[in-house]
UniProtKB/Swiss-Prot annotation:
Stated name of the protein: Protein GPR107
GO cellular component, one term: Golgi apparatus
Reported modifications of this chain: Cleaved by FURIN to yield two fragments that remain associated via a disulfide bond.
Residues recorded with modification Phosphoserine: 537
Length: 551
């Protein structure tokens, strides 16, 4: 019987890598959930996406700008720069059309836009203007620069930092307090408020609540800095911003599409735990046909189940208090890391045929692992940084793009071992006289290749498109599809490679082992006179104790 050879330096490399990432997990501090705080200094971006949140009726958002200033370098020609905020409302997570226009397009200079409310700042005059679209009717909430009794019943009393400057603003504010948070299409659409200014730094607070069913939707808050024409890159004005955002639905700090997620994660964790328990029962029942890879496969559903449980706990605390408990968040990050690394390692090991059709990883196989494991580590690091970083920071977009690219490379890399095994079996079926067995293995490997492609397609492409296609309150269907596709992939992989004597993948021929061990045997003088003994079936002629040792 061929004895599995330790992975040596490759295994120690993996161990060091996992220790390093575990240390990184402990150093990461989770972001404050749905109670956001963002500090930007000397930023020159034209547009900053502050946040996106799905609101139900009676939900609200409070935006507290504690300091905002514009810094103009010496000799700057960007004297007529405009700054302000925009509140965009959509029915799903699709892209806002007005944000995808020309790079020099400035939304703050538009007099009227459907489904967009503008908050335009005049720092020199200590004035803020609120421009609401007249054609929106009752579809948008009213932005208010004064305390609101309805919001006070659900949150801490916001400080009064601005006063209406005209009678129209007072009438609108009174109407808002009466529960009529809508935009009258016949009213004046622009209102002005005074704001506090000290040494060129302004501070103010505004908020809104969703008072009708028609106002429900996905709201995105942006900060804009519109430069003047013909401004050179080195002469652009920069801004410094310190802002806190609190958003809440009636009974949860979670966005409308995230409210069902804690229950969903707990339910899926039970399914993964049940599938892992069934798999353990199968391994114990067919002990003679079990390999080490089978036990590695057994660890996967339990790790996935733990990750989902901790994720549900994390979301539960965010839902109830607006931010996670740091300890639970770190535990979730660690289990998420282990699950991701274990998943890709297991897929790659099955694809190479390790412990099934060969007991030694070739140099080509080891190179795949030297690529896949660091990529998977980098993908997990990117995911953790994204979860721990505010959306408006400069590095958020970089890490988000990096996560997408690295995850795509990971998915492509794990397909190579399967393709190589298919080619190897195609050549073997035509040369070694055992066409029936090799063709059965070949058919199974092709099925496994299709299975991996479908898994990647559903979890990376279909689920991603679903997130942008469904209404905002059904955004959780994206996670449901992702977790369901993962569960189906686990079950089908276990069924295809289950420990059974009639499984074509496990019907090994001694010649397959000889091909891998040929160089070792021919260079050993001690084994010069040894004869080959043909093996009838996988595990049928070996004593039970020997198989237990390799499993």
């Amino acid at each position: 019987m061929a004895v599995p050879v330790p992975l040596g330096r490759f295994g120690s490399f993996c161990l060091r890598l996992l220790r390093l990432l575990a240390l990184l997990e402990l150093l990461v501090h989770p972001v404050l959930g749905r109670v956001h705080h963002l500090a930007l200094k000397d930023d020159v971006r034209h547009k900053v996406h502050l946040n996106t949140f799905g609101f139900f009726k009676d939900g609200y958002m409070v935006v507290n700008v504690s300091s905002l200033s514009v810094n103009e370098p010496e000799g700057a020609t960007d004297k007529d720069a405009e700054i302000g905020f925009s509140l965009d409302r959509t029915k799903n997570d699709g892209f806002s059309s007005y944000l995808d226009e020309d790079v020099n397009y400035c939304i703050l200079k538009k007099k009227s836009m459907s489904s967009v409310t503008l908050v335009i700042l005049d720092i020199s005059g200590s004035i803020v203007k609120v421009r609401s679209p007249p054609e929106a009717g009752k579809q948008l909430p009213e932005i208010v620069f004064s305390k609101d009794e309805k919001i006070l019943s659900q949150s801490q009393e916001p400080a009064v930092s601005s006063n209406p400057k005209d009678s129209e603003a007072r009438r609108t504010l009174d109407g808002f307090k009466a529960g009529r948070s809508t935009v009258d299409s016949k009213a004046i659409t622009e209102r002005s408020f005074s704001i506090h200014k000290n040494d060129g730094v302004v501070s103010f607070q505004f908020f809104f609540n969703i008072s009708t069913d028609d106002q429900e939707g996905l709201y995105s808050l942006y900060f804009h800095k519109c430069s003047g024409n013909n401004v050179k890159p080195g002469e652009q004005a920069s801004f410094s911003l310190n802002i806190a955002i609190t958003e809440k639905n009636p009974n949860s700090y979670l966005s409308a599409g995230e409210i069902p997620l804690p229950k969903l994660y707990v339910s899926m964790a039970l399914f993964f735990f049940l599938s892992g328990t069934i798999w353990i029962h199968i391994l114990r029942k067919r002990r003679n046909d079990v390999f080490k890879i089978h036990w590695l496969m057994a660890a996967l559903p339990f790790t996935k189940s733990l990750s989902l449980v901790f994720h549900a706990i994390d979301y539960h605390y965010i839902s109830s208090q607006g931010f996670p408990i740091e300890g639970w968040a770190v535990v979730y990050y660690i289990t998420h890391l282990l699950k991701g690394a274990l998943l890709f390692i297991t897929i790659a090991l099955i694809g190479t045929g390790w412990a099934f059709i060969k007991h030694i990883l070739s140099d080509k196989d080891k190179k795949i692992f030297m690529i896949v494991i660091p990529l998977q580590v980098l993908a997990n690091v990117a995911y953790i940084i994204i979860e721990s970083t505010e959306e408006g920071t400069t590095e958020y977009g970089l890490w988000k793009d990096s996560l997408f690219l690295v995850d795509l490379l990971c998915c492509g890399a794990i397909l190579f071992p399967v393709v190589w095994s298919i080619r190897h079996l195609q050549e073997a079926s035509a040369t070694d006289g055992k066409a029936a067995i090799n063709l059965a293995k070949l058919r199974l490997f092709r099925h496994y290749y299709v299975l991996i492609v479908c898994y990647i397609y559903f979890t990376r492409i279909i689920a991603f498109l679903l997130k942008f296609a469904v209404p905002f309150q059904w955004k959780w269907l994206y996670q449901l599809l992702d977790e369901t596709a993962t569960l189906v992939f686990f079950v089908l992989t276990g069924y295809k490679f289950r420990p059974a004597s009639d499984n074509p993948y496990l019907q090994l021929s001694q010649e397959d082992d000889d091909l891998e061990m040929e160089s070792v045997v021919t260079t050993s003088g001690v084994m010069e006179n040894m004869k080959k003994v043909k093996k009838v079936s996988n595990g049928a002629v070996e004593p039970q104790g020997s198989w237990e040792g390799t499993a």
